[in-house]
């Protein structure tokens, strides 16, 4: 069955990729992570409005589900929701070039979902 074989072949539909297509040498690695990234964090702390200037947050969404209503199949749970959330993330990237991260929650009551203030 083509539906299952594609999912099994690729072990999911999405991945993250580096924007820097060049070789990541020691100097770049030190800049992208530690210690160089500290300067970027300090710049954002000084001016939070600069967050999109330095990070992917200007082109990022979360695709979130608890698996309680999967494509008309009903409540199949969060694990069964993951391929659907990946598919939605794929659509965001393919049609709008928006990076999307699938997130499934193992809670079903709104009161169980404790979301703090968004920082992005």
Task: List the model feature ranges, each with a label.
Residues 12-53:
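An N-cap/entry alpha-helix motif that binds or orients negatively charged groups
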Residues 46-53, 94, 98-117:
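An N-terminal-biased, well-structured beta-alpha scaffold segment characteristic
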Residues 1-2, 119:
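Short, small-residue-biased leader/transition segments that mark boundaries at the very start
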Residues 6-11, 15-22, 88-100:
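Extended, charged alpha/beta regions that create polyanion-binding interfaces
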Residues 8, 51-57, 64, 93-94:
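Solvent-exposed alpha-helices and their adjacent loops that cap or buttress functional pockets
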Residues 71-85:
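Glycine- and acidic-residue-enriched helix-capping/strand-helix junction motifs
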Residues 38, 45-60, 73, 86, ...:
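Short, glycine/charged-enriched hinge/interface segments at domain edges or termini
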Residues 24-25, 65-75, 92-102:
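Gly-rich Lys/Arg/Thr-decorated short loops/hinges at beta-loop-alpha junctions or inter-strand turns
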